[in-house]
Amino acid sequence: MSGLYMMATISDRNQARRFLDFYREYGLSVTLLTYGRGTAASEILDAFGLEAAEKAVIFSVVTGEEWKRLKTGLERQIKIDIPGSGIAFIVPVSSIGGKKQFEFLTDGRGFVKGEESTLKDTKYELLVVIANQGYTELVMDAARAAHAPGGTVIHAKGTGAEKAEKFFGVSLAKEKEVIFMVTRKEGKMPS
């Protein structure tokens, strides 16, 4: 497994420091940390007397070999394979916007870009939905109807709305919600 990947880790917010320390221990110095919230249905939360979970979302760029090492460490040290301890996954990176950006993201690890290859069979896929603020529950209702287990929401601001507004002739909301869901491949609708 070679290549460059965007690694995402989603955990409870109070576990962020633990993951960041773990990644630093494994030599990853360039990470992006942001916060989101879980999307468990309110009736499930009410039944267990829980509140909506605040989530930490950590992004980093890793090589295929680094991912193998990290995955083993995550399972052995963090016990990430136990439900409720977080989730980590990778997405292939097909391009990076310039030499300086590439060097920054690979942090001098000596990665040499090889030939591009097609995506191999995977059991899971990352579904990313960008919706106007306030529509997350509508998105999650549809996802749950298709048996998606849940997701993580990050509040964001849309950019480039001026061009889209000119094209559509209506004003567009700038406040967005980015919803990440990891789903089994067989549960994904065909495109």
Predicted regions span which residues?
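Positively charged, small/polar-rich N-terminal and surface patches that mediate targeting and assembly
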Residues: M1-S191
